From Swiss-Prot:
Family under the similarity heading: Belongs to the small GTPase superfamily. Rab family.
Principal localisation: membrane
Reactions mediated catalytically: GTP + H2O = GDP + phosphate + H(+)
Database matches in NCBIfam families: small_GTP
Short motif (Switch 1): ranges: 31-45
Entries under SUPFAM superfamilies matching the protein: P-loop containing nucleoside triphosphate hydrolases
Species in which this protein is naturally found: Pongo abelii (Sumatran orangutan)
Binding partners and assembly: Interacts (GTP-bound form) with MICALL1; regulates RAB8A association with recycling endosomes. Interacts with MICALL2; competes with RAB13 and is involved in E-cadherin endocytic recycling. Interacts (GTP-bound form) with MICAL1, MICALCL, MICAL3, EHBP1 and EHBP1L1; at least in case of MICAL1, MICALCL, MICAL3 and EHBP1L1 two molecules of RAB8A can bind to one molecule of the effector protein; ternary complexes of RAB8A, RAB13 and either MICAL1 or EHBP1L1 are possible. Interacts with EHD1. Interacts with MAP4K2 and SYTL4. Interacts with SGSM1 and SGSM3.
InterPro entries: P-loop_NTPase, Small_GTP-bd, Small_GTPase, Small_GTPase_Rab
Gene: RAB8A
Annotated Pfam families: Ras
Protein's UniProt name: Ras-related protein Rab-8A
Amino acid sequence: MAKTYDYLFKLLLIGDSGVGKTCVLFRFSEDAFNSTFISTIGIDFKIRTIELDGKRIKLQIWDTAGQERFRTITTAYYRGAMGIMLVYDITNEKSFDNIRNWIRNIEEHASADVEKMILGNKRDVNDKRQVSKERGEKLALDYGIKFMETSAKANINVENAFFTLARDIKAKMDKKLEGNSPQGSNQGVKITPDQQKRSSFFRCVLL
């Protein structure tokens, strides 16, 4: 029997290959952790429905490949995203340095008002840390976006990160609706029973 969802939010996970984007996604969507995931090929997505302020919000979360050869494919998914999480690995300096490049990709391909958040993942491996929390916080401050350190393995801040991003998107949408502003490309999608989309797992494999 079809359920009614009040809103559908499209979220995107981006960042270098190997930073743990897929693990973060599976921790949030399945409350599970698997250290043997292979690198994402193309695009995957998962769906989870949450409740915020008495509204049921269906989150469609897209996990993108970090490898350069998939960049053209993955940037096509930026448009229409309402929230983007930029993920780096706190034990990998290069993945942190590349966050600025990922932000440039967002500026080139995503809607101007997309909500963004930076995640410093693998917080559980503190003994191998190369990027301090303070540097992550400063980078986020430079761009005026939120920051959290997470661990998909130890289940630290993953739930909090997704709920915070969803709450920010909803607040922005509510403000637009209250102001009766013209509908933009990133307006929330209200869902009725006949418009339910499949919540099955999808993988786009490039041969």
